[in-house]
Amino acid sequence: MKLGIVIFPSKMIQDKANGLRKRYDPHYALVPPHITLKAPFEAPEEQLETIVKELRTIANKTNPFTLHVGKVGSFAPVNNVIYFKVEKTPELTFLNEEMHKGFLTQEREYAFVPHLTIAQKLSDAEHADILGRLRMKDFYYEQTIDRFHLLYQLENETWNVHETFHLGKGSK
């Protein structure tokens, strides 16, 4: 089964991102706006319980933290993805690193750059035009993050939450 681990921002941030994603992201209908902690990976269904236990341990070791989202960035020229920048806090870095250790180890395709995708699969001309327009706008949001989610992908390529993990000691 295909799994992924993400943080969902507040509804306000999701609404702002979706206003842009509707027009510029072909994956708009497949998954809500999110910050990827661990890129999609394959795991046999019989390992799911072990993965869930490991994620509970990680959640218990991580305190809630403030997420800062602002400004627009791009991964060009590697690919034409436009995103809201997310400040790389020690907590986000810790979560990402923990999700690539031990049982969850996997080869990373890219360095960890926390972000919220708002446009992708654009032509070079579309990318330049949209990025230029969005960089002129002022975006800044912050919120407390107290959970992350393990997602699984369905046959129709949509993603659903398998389990939510609350941050901090005493979380279940």
From Swiss-Prot:
One GO MF term: hydrolase activity, acting on ester bonds
Active-site residues, Swiss-Prot/TrEMBL: 34 (proton donor), 115 (proton acceptor)
Segments traversing the membrane: none
Keyword match Hydrolase: yes
Intrachain S-S bonds: none
HXTX 1, short sequence motif: residues: 34-37
Motif HXTX 2, residue range(s) on this chain: 115-118
EC number assigned by the record: 3.1.-.-
Hydrolase as UniProt keyword: yes
Keywords: Hydrolase
Pfam family, one: 2_5_RNA_ligase2
Family, per entry: Belongs to the 2H phosphoesterase superfamily. YjcG family.
HAMAP family in UniProt: 2H_phosphoesterase_YjcG (MF_01444)
PANTHER family named among the record's database cross-references: PHOSPHOESTERASE SAOUHSC_00951-RELATED (PTHR40037:SF1), PHOSPHOESTERASE YJCG-RELATED (PTHR40037)
Designated name of the protein: Putative phosphoesterase Bcer98_0945
